[in-house]
Amino acid sequence: MKATVLRLYMHESRRFRGMLLYEWLLEQGRKLGIHGGSAFRAVAGYGRHGVLHEQRFFELAGELPVVTEFIVSEADAERILALVRKENIDLVYVCWPAEYAATSAPDAPAAPGPASDSPGGTS
């Protein structure tokens, strides 16, 4: 099925309306009726200022990048971005078309069996 991947980037400690921003974004997605969203914390990263952030010292807590991701329709991606703009939240985001499916879907291609994909296996 066709979808749009929307990723929004922020520091993990960034807050909005008394909540961590990534939690607020996920909550807003739920309120918009979006079926799922996830937040991922980076191990390390740097942004436009070139400063590398890593979790090495307790003092750096909250400085690592977090990505909040939604796999949605193009219209739902626009709804999320419209809300972010309306709330005047300054974020970097990326958006691209994708296809999604579940491996348990009836029309998913069958996985190759052990005999056909193992070296020296019998067929």
Please identify what each model-predicted range represents:
Residues 1-123:
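Positively charged, small/polar-rich N-terminal and surface patches that mediate targeting and assembly
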